[in-house]
Amino acid sequence: MRKSQKNCIDMLRFLTAVLLFSVSIAAFAQVRDFDMQTADGNAFSLDSIRTPLTLLYFQDPDCDMCHAVTDSLSRSAVVREAVANRRLTVLTVYVGDDRQLWESTLNRFPGEWTNVIDCTFSSLDKYFYSAPPTLYLSGLEKDALLSETSARNVISFLETTEN
């Protein structure tokens, strides 16, 4: 075996180990509460959510990728059904201080979704996201089932765990 092939194999093993380690950490992670407000100014807490699954969707009103994720999730039959059957709560979170911009864009989201604003940026201490959109799926006990994932992965998860 040539040295370059061995280096490639070693690198693949290393990257696989890093990926497995990341997945194992995510499997034991908990989603954590932070300061949130609804559009009417009321405080909101993750502890108030009683559905078996919660999708934390960090988004930004000016983000084109966020618009695509919103479309994908809102058009997905399995997401709509899970929300309608009270199996899933979709919680959109705008991390920012432009409340007027946020409120002007709330009509982009399905009425069954819960929309909150983190105008104190408190979620930045508890969640890693480099840029919106960022999705976290958690279970009833607030265990992170999927961390920093895609809409496609959320939909696939819901399809495989239906019923």
Residue ranges and their predicted role:
Residues 81, 139-163:
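Thiol-/selenol-based redox modules, centered on thioredoxin-like
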Residues 103-138:
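Short, internal strand/loop/helix patches
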Residues 46-67, 91:
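Short active-site neighborhood of thiol/selenol oxidoreductases, capturing the structured segment around
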Residues 37, 114-119, 148-149:
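Short acidic-hydrophobic, aromatic-tinged amphipathic segments that line or gate anion-handling sites
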Residues 85-100, 111-121:
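Thiol-based oxidoreductase modules, predominantly thioredoxin-like and allied folds used
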Residues 52-53, 68-92:
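Conserved helix-turn-beta segment immediately C-terminal to the redox Cys motif
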Residues 26-48:
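N-terminal "domain-start" segment that seeds a small globular fold
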Residues 1-31:
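Bacterial Sec-dependent N-terminal signal peptides
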